[in-house]
Amino acid sequence: MQLLLKSIFTCALFVIFVYATAQSLLKVQETEARQAYLNVTSSSSSNLSQDDGHFLSRRLRQVSHGEEGDEGAPSQMDDELEQMTKVHGEAPDAEELRECSEGLVLPLWMPQRNISVGDRLVRGFVYFVLLIYLFVGVSIIADRFMAAIEAITSIERAVVVKGPNNTKQVMHVRIWNETVANLTLMALGSSAPEILLSVIEIYAKDFESGDLGPGTIVGSAAYNLFMIIAVCMIWIPAGEVRRIRHLRVFFVTALFSVFAYVWLWLILSVFTPGVILVWEAIVTLLFFPLTVLWAYIAERRLLVYKYMDKNYRVNKRGTVVAGEHDQVEMDAEKGPKQPMVTSARGNDAEAFDEARREYITLLTELRQKYPDADLEQLEMMAQEQVLARSSKSRAFYRIQATRKMVGSGNLMRKIQERAHSDLTEVKAQLHAGDDEEADDPIRMYFEPGHYTVMENCGEFEVRVVRRGDISTYASVEYETQDGTASAGTDFVGRKGLLSFPPGVDEQRFRIEVIDDDVFEEDECFYIRLFNPSEGVKLAVPMIATVMILDDDHAGIFAFTDSVFEITESVGRFELKVMRYSGARGTVIVPYWTENDTATESKDYEGARGELVFENNESEKFIDLFILEESSYEKDVSFKVHIGEPRLAPDDELAAKIKEVEKKPVQDLTELDRILLLSKPRNGELTTAYVRIRESQEFKATVDKLVAKANVSAVLGTSSWKEQFKDALTVIPADESEFDNDDEEEEVPSCFSYVSHFVCLFWKVLFAFVPPTDICGGYVTFVVSIFVIGVITAIIGDAASYFGCALNIKDSVTAILFVALGTSIPDTFASMIAAKHDEGADNCIGNVTGSNAVNVFLGIGLAWTIAAVYHSSHGMTFNVEPGTIGFAVALFCGEALIAIMLIMFRRWHKGIGAELGGPKVSKYISAAILVFLWVFYVVICILEAYDVIRV
């Protein structure tokens, strides 16, 4: 069906073109015949005039009658020729055969007189091909211009907002308001050729009015409103709809887009017919900032708009009071009413939170889809999806469309590369502190800082490490210090010097522990580092703690702390159970988990089992597995218990204790009592709370990635190297956004290669334009608009020569050919936006806004310059209403029909949206819009050639 519509559309254009060309060439042929006939007649008249003037008139009449009889030429033409020869002595009206005038940039194809029809057709074809190539070039440089505009409008500033728990949070928001950007720089970027053509034509014609510039603007407006919206209606996938979100802004731009052409009609035909005064031109130009201001007020709900969401009633005293909020948003999606949540944090903060929630939701979905992928891979895929789904500007879709047409590939590939670089950059920032040790001074410390030894271990080894620069010699002294353990009784005191030759990063020494047979509590002593050599600093731990466990007791068992705080991304967590005050025998300690605020199988895996402490073993670990949900904010806990410890049945100490327990109390010796006291028992900390919090690294990663989720960055370039690489590389224009499962590399299609080599000249030429990263895009902005101006001037000359070669009027060339050439990229951009955007603002809202801006800025600026110039020279700026006035009036009527059709589709229960909807309704609506455009073009052409007179 889409192919059929494209074929019908192409055939309609071809028929219109053939008709206009045939009519023009017919007039050319008739005029050439008249000219030849007149030349012959004039030559005969010149020879006879010396003899008899009366004979001349009679002879002319005879020849006239003879021609009528022999050749069948109309007598009316002969009478006109005779009359004109008598009165003027010259050729017929010069308008019948237009002679081309020299252009502003493009040289004129000579000669201009005595050209055959075949020559004119060849010249017309050459100019037509040149126009197409120029349209491609201006489309490519316009994309550079749009990228610069995107870089300018995406400038951000840091603001501090309060989080849900009154925590301060720094976020970056755009300085430019979206509506203001769309109606100013974005509109200028998408319509720069039309606007500049209007201004350049005024200058090229010595500040006199022309038909090409205004005709292009009016023709482009008609094509945008009718054809682009029609194509977007049927381009929406089956079963989907797209609605305008900012309906207030759409109403403002739609109102001004119609009023703009009503205003043109007023100043052309009503106020001062045929004359544009200075005040009229200036007011036309001032309507541009007024449109932007009004749209901004509507979008921000300022002035009267802030009262439009409230209901009002009159109380008993006759006072108007505000009622309850009606909870209906004009730009809300169709569906159940939702209460409005007012937040002091502002729209930017709410948008940031929404983007963050979307990122986390995507991460959860991807975790379920790819359960074997690690967190970093999931974060990469989530960032790709966030960038792909994030809000995109008109510039993105315009550049995306052009890149596909000229073989430069899909912007989604750049998004994928950007996601990888973003994640790498964020991870590097988060771990930056881990890689800065090389710049620190030389440090020495114990590793580890805590030692637990048995009383009967004999000796144990202590390790001291050096970090930083190890290329020099360094030294440090150490000594033992008493704690609850005393030197000489529990250990052998020691003092010494540790030397670190160049290249050595650690040294070790040994401490001896003294064993005895007396039961005693656990004891500890310390080892201290001091007096480091020059250039060496002592770092923590500079004091090591040594715990001596008695080997005559089975031990006391407990957790090291009552609360353990972990992150959900830890995966496996080892919970330590300590055995102190002895480590004799094999002891079994039961353990189990219990829900608190955390839920088993959701937040953690339940565990139940027994720990077996072998003889002289002082610590064991309970393996706990934490289930990660990638929650941005999480705070839940569960309990871990240890039960009563018991000696292993086959343990030697257990057998001895059983024998002693059989004895009467009065028969127990001192050694028996000590043996009974050595039974294992629990300490105070038998229950530990494990608190699961969100991962701070994950939280920081989310914040940074969401802050970086700006598609604008992929539109710009950072270096000339990147630009020339893009210009010389053929990239496949694949339609898919991402394909994580397909590892096969795609190959560019034949169309990609052909379009690449056709556009290679433009791509290489425009690679010299400065990158957008220079001065925030402003240099690119200035250079691009200059280049667009030069190419637009050439387009103006080529379009004029094209019309002149085929004797087509400038007004027809502008409305039909130039308007189409400048609007084709916008058509493809709107199609992509319609398919991928969630709303219809980038398809419909930008059309009405662009139409209004084109008139107020394009025609207003050009006419202001011309009116001021003529006024300064004491003259008036004359503009013949003619075809422009008729086209404006016709467009206004059809525009109202189109806008009413769009609103009818939105409010109709069976459709409910401007774009998409049921198959039959969307094709009928699109057909109506296509008919409006074809009717508009045909009537304008017929009026231009006086086939119909208004």
Curated annotation (Swiss-Prot):
Cytoplasmic side stretches: 142-179, 238-257, 300-749, 797-813, 870-883, 945-950
Residue ranges crossing the lipid bilayer per the database entry: 121-141, 180-200, 217-237, 258-278, 279-299, 750-770, 776-796, 814-834, 849-869, 884-904, 924-944
Binding site residues for Ca(2+) 3: E455, D515, D516, D551, D552
InterPro entries according to UniProt: CaCA (IPR051171), CalX-like_sf (IPR038081), Calx_beta (IPR003644), Na_Ca_Ex (IPR004836), Na_Ca_Ex_C-exten (IPR032452), NaCa_Exmemb (IPR004837), NCX_ion-bd_dom_sf (IPR044880)
Catalytically driven reaction(s): Ca(2+)(in) + 3 Na(+)(out) = Ca(2+)(out) + 3 Na(+)(in)
Positions bound to Ca(2+) 4: E455, D516, V518, E520, D550, D552
Effect of T822I: Disruption in the ability to maintain electric potential upon stimulation with light
Main localization of the protein described in the UniProt heading: membrane
Location of region: Corresponds to the exchanger inhibitory peptide (XIP) found in other sodium/calcium exchange proteins and thought to be involved in calmodulin binding: 301-318
Subcellular location field: Cell membrane; Cell projection, Rhabdomere membrane
Extracellular compartment spans: 23-120, 201-216, 771-775, 835-848, 905-923
One Gene Ontology cellular component annotation held by this UniProt entry: sarcolemma
Result after altering P193L: Disruption in the ability to maintain electric potential upon stimulation with light
Keyword Cell wall biogenesis/degradation among UniProt keywords: no
Regulation: Activated by a Na(+) electrochemical gradient but also undergoes Na(2+)-dependent inactivation. Inhibited by micromolar levels of cytoplasmic Ca(2+), which is the opposite of most characterized mammalian homologs.
Molecular-function GO terms, alphabetical: calcium ion binding; calcium:sodium antiporter activity; calmodulin binding
Keywords for this protein: Antiport, Calcium, Calcium transport, Calmodulin-binding, Cell membrane, Cell projection, Glycoprotein, Ion transport, Membrane, Metal-binding, Repeat, Signal, Sodium, Sodium transport, Transmembrane, Transmembrane helix, Transport
Protein function: Na(+)/Ca(2+) antiporter that couples the energy of a Na(+) electrochemical gradient to the movement of Ca(2+) against an electrochemical gradient across a membrane, which contributes to the regulation of cytoplasmic Ca(2+) levels. Mediates Na(+)/Ca(2+) exchange in photoreceptor cells and involved in controlling Ca(2+) levels during phototransduction, affecting magnitude of the photoresponse, activation kinetics, signal amplification, response termination, and light adaptation.
Family designation: Belongs to the Ca(2+):cation antiporter (CaCA) (TC 2.A.19) family. SLC8 subfamily.
Domain notes: Contains 2 Calx-beta domains. Calx-beta domain 1 binds two pairs of Ca(2+) ions. Binding of Ca(2+) induces a conformational shift that inhibits the Na(+)/Ca(2+) antiporter activity. Calx-beta domain 2 does not bind Ca(2+). Calx-beta domain 2 contributes to the cooperative binding of Ca(2+) to Calx-beta domain 1.
Protein name (record): Sodium/calcium exchanger Calx
Species this protein is from: Drosophila melanogaster
Organism classification: Eukaryota, Metazoa, Ecdysozoa, Arthropoda, Hexapoda
Protein encoded by which gene: Calx
